[in-house]
Amino acid sequence: MNSVRQSCRPKHQVLILKCYPRFQKGVQSVKPNSSELSYLLYYASTRRSKLQKVGAFLEKRAARDVWRGKLGNVQVTLQILAALIEKVPRDLPLYARSILTVLDIVLRSREISMVEETIPTFELFCRHQDSATLTADHEYIIQYRELVGTYASFASTETPVTTKTPMSAPMALRWRTVGLKAIKSIVTSEILSTDGAKQLNVVIPVILQNLYASGDHRLSPLQEKAKSSERLEREQFRRRRMSISTVQTVDTIDGNGDPESASGSAADADMMAEMEARVLALRCLEKVFSGTNRVQIRFATSLVLSFIVSRRPPRTQEKQRSANGKTDGNWATNLLEVIANWSPVQDRFIILVTLLETLVERPLVDGQLEPQLTLASMMDWLLGSSVNLIGLSVMDVLIGLLQFVRQLLQLGNGTQTLVPHHGLSTLIKPLPQMDETAATNSQTNGENEKAPTADSLRHELLELLENCIGNLATHVYYGDQVSDMIRTIVIRIKPSPALEGENAHHESESDNAIQKSSPSRSDYTAESYFSSSAARITALRSVKDILVVANLRKSTSGTDPDARNRVPLHVWEGTHWLLQDPQWEVRNAYVDAFLSWLQLETKKSDLRVPTEHTRVSKMGNRRDTSDIPERLARRIVSTAPQEENVAACHASSFLQLLHLTIFDVVSESSTTESDILRLYLLLVNLVEHLGVNAARYTLPVLMKLQDTLPSSVSASKALHIGSLVHGYLLALVEKFDLEGTRPAAEIINEISKRKKRGVWLDKIQLPPRPLHHIQPSLDTVIEQASLPQPDKNIYSRFTSLEELVRQIESTYNSSYVSPPISPSNSPGRSFSIPSLGLNNSTNPHVPAGSQLPLHVKEHMLAPWSKEACLDAIEKEKAKTSSLSGSRTATGAFAAGLNALNMSAYNSGPGSPTGTAPSASNRQDRPVSAAYAPTGNLAGFQKTRRQSIPERRVSPAASSRDSTVRVNELRRVLSVINSSNVRHPSPLRGRHRVDSTVSSTESMVSDNLSFSDAGTAAADRPLSSRENLTAPRGLNRYHGGPNQLHGDFEPEYIPPVPPLPSSLAIPGGFPADSRSGSSVTSPSHSPPRSDRPSTAPGRPARTHSKSKGSNASTLRQSRSLSRKKSLDTSLHERSERRATDLNGIPSGHSHGYSEDLGDIGIAITADTTEIAPHTQDRADTSSQWSRREASRTLSFGRRVDMDKLLEGLSAPNDDQQPNGTGEVSGIKIASSGVEGSSSLTRMGKKPSFQSMNDEKKASYSRKTSLLSPGAAPWNRLSSDRGGIGPPPY
């Protein structure tokens, strides 16, 4: 009967039924028959139409087995489905709904043994399912979500599973473990990215319920166990897959257990099982945040935050962290930090942004601020942690926090009091100490409070928001971030409407000078302002927190606090009016923030007076042939000094406005003792950290206040002013170490006299009293009747101001220490690099920044008045606008630089006039980068010849020139003198063209004599294209002409090889060389010797056009690539210079060195190939010219280009056969020219004569010296003048 029934069944049903084993009793784990299962899988994989029928039959079989309670058959059914998924995963959508139906049937049985068997099948299903199927089939989506909800309900701790039997603790733990394993498969599935919102909304709360423990907030042990369990899983995956027929023995099962739990009690085993469940929940949460889907991370973070807010974790640990510096935190903060570490580095900022959005979007209800407190404490912890939030928009987060602070301050109609109840000492927070000795008094009243009030909650939330703003400085990702943060807060501080009405007449007096708010305030709405006293206090305390955190903590980006740019002084622009705020708390908070800036953001370099940077002309950039990125970098770099000038102008305006406000505060009749002490503390700290930069403004103001002493209305006002003035003068004596001088004795005697007469404030002392000790409640009550009336006898004026300023100047000048010069890693703010020239003078050079500028000294001695101060501020404002946006100012700076350079030529120490530059130029003008020396190396005169070409460094050089180049260092170490320096060859290759020099490839030497420079400057106007700079050798001849003659000793000059009598220059000479009038000038040439005239150290030959005129010509550089027609000029010069000579004379033979002396060409090549003779040159000139093109020439002396150009422009008789007219070469007779200082002009083309026997012999002897190894001066091809392929 059974066989008949089987024969009527379809084949797929028969194959399925054969997989179930017959005998299942006594077997712990039932598995399908392996051979029958293999055939079933083959049958289903080869016939896709049978997959749906197989799934439908397994549904019926599972329903019947679950109803009958046959656990073994249920296990076989689930294993058949798992094997089918592994065999045909591509066709999973055909039978996916059948799998979900089978799983749902088993889960509804509420039998833990059956439900546990569904986990392996569900894991495979989640691993292989397709997300496209989920989006296409709506019924499938609903069925899958119901299955996810069922598994999540098993893992929930709040809604236990309803079973037929009572639930025990171990059984509940088993249900939770099953649910968590299924959730782990859900969060690792690809389908989560498609339907993540619905699934995460169900899964995340359940995970957090299992992870949350009210008594244990440590997550580090769980993380360690999670890593170990994950490692074990990886090892199991690496093992060979076991056969389904393999039976595990008891020893194998026991070996997988935990020996600790086996040896412990039942309670220990339950505790270990609970720990395993929490570890599993932690791994599930890690899978959610370790993905790269930002939408998923954002949504999951919002769910985590909602769960944490609902749990209301304690905030006591947060208070302890803010007081002690660090602590373990609570469960919520640790969880948030762990989640941030799990997330990808580039996506971690999403967590903080989501946290801020959750905080801002939650409605504010007075008295119900617990959720905001929890979120703010978590944000404070995350910002203060070491988690790198790269990609975070710090400014957006800052603006969002400021807006939330404004909303919080408006809560309760703005009538709430933000001062804490336990005293005023916490309003001014002292700077944290590194030795951790700060008192922790924030917990004194925490135990006594029964229930927090609305005011206390607002105040606590406000403190947390201030800490959040300050901790933003931990994450510094660009140089000016801290400055931008402070400026963003400062520009939102606005006076209250009442204060604006009181000071309306003051604003009319200084309409443009005194601005109580930044001009950029118009960009913001009125709601963004901090106009109340509480808002201003909060903003100023936030500024202080930013400064403290930025300096005491290392940035999470991996850089030290020194890596960022310092906060400049001009960020405080527009805040001086806060010294006149009606509320003393606001005045204290402002002084506290400003003192924090002075202590943390100033360095020793701020004690020096900043030098103004000048811009050089950009006209030379038109001929700049450097690449575009280099020019762009140079353009950006060159604007930095002008930005520094603008910042210096802003800082000067702020200091003047600050001192003007101090004058107004002291002059008011309502000024109290605490106000005087606060101003005294501010002034002393200003001079302590800014030096003369602050004293230049303070001294005139205090002298003006001193003049008002006899006319003071009340005796208390005279007491305040007198104590403030002389207390500050005593601080100057202490700062500049003036003890023992006459002004110091006068100041100390006056203070002693006033103390004896009882007209001195005892609280004016050095060091000044701390700010938290200056409070209105501690002011001393002064009786007017007990004070004598102010007169000239009691309050003696300080009259030694000039002597005091002179002593300050002396101390300033003597305290200068020249800093060592070292190459910087990147172009900083100082782009004007002094040239590495040598100073051979006996007097040491004093840098420009070492002396106190004259205008600073005059400013300290000048009388002060309100009108003059406002006029000076207006001038500074006009100068700032001109420097920042006007092209006229740029031209003026360039013209001024050219004028200074020309004055350096005409009035230098080595000039014929003998006049030195003025003292004002030496002190006030920055040292030019073209000739500023770096040291006195006058003792090294005997130097070797240098093989490195000289370069001029311009102030607007590119970023590559911002560091000291290796070539420049070698030039300094070799102590090169300009008299014997070989200059770069124009044919060697192109060097980088500088922005202020037209070409470094000029054929005219740049080592000009002083008389040449002076004459040229006087004879012709300065061209806009010729940006003259001082030559490198200018500051080397301070010793005068005698020293100059002493440098040209022949024994120190290396030998130079002789030249062939015939020379062929490929391509000819450029046609744009300057051919000005040639006149003679007194030359500082050394005595004649047997050395060739083409030697590099030899001065230029004197040219004689007329015997009666003596002058020199300053030849300008011309680029070799310029093209210019000379037909007209050559014709005019031919008619004007008629002579009786037809070519090069050959009357006197003065050797080879005289042959090319008139032309001025020096060949420094070690020639290995001899030029052909004259008779063979006609047919081999083309090949010989190409061979000669590989030779390296160096034009180290001036050249008479008229003579060469006329000869080259003449028609050539030796035309090539192809008719190209190529110049084959120039043959020059070996006979010299009579006299070494005369030059014969040619009126016609030169005649090239043939060589006789005597000349041929001389030629052969001379050319034999040019072969390699023939002379000891032969150099390698890598040296200058060596043989080698040209760089072009």
From Swiss-Prot:
InterPro entries in the cross-refs: ARM-type_fold, EFR3, EFR3_HEAT-like_rpt
Transmembrane segments: none
Family: Belongs to the EFR3 family.
Region annotation (Disordered) ranges: 500-522, 816-835, 906-964, 980-1155, 1167-1195, 1208-1288
Gene Ontology cellular component list: plasma membrane
Compositionally biased intervals (Polar residues): 511-522, 906-921, 995-1012, 1212-1221
BP GO terms, sorted: protein localization to plasma membrane
Protein name: Protein EFR3
Comp. bias intervals (Low complexity): 1073-1083
Biased composition (Basic and acidic residues): 1124-1139, 1174-1190
Organism in which the protein naturally occurs: Coccidioides immitis (strain RS) (Valley fever fungus)
Superkingdom classification of source: Eukaryota
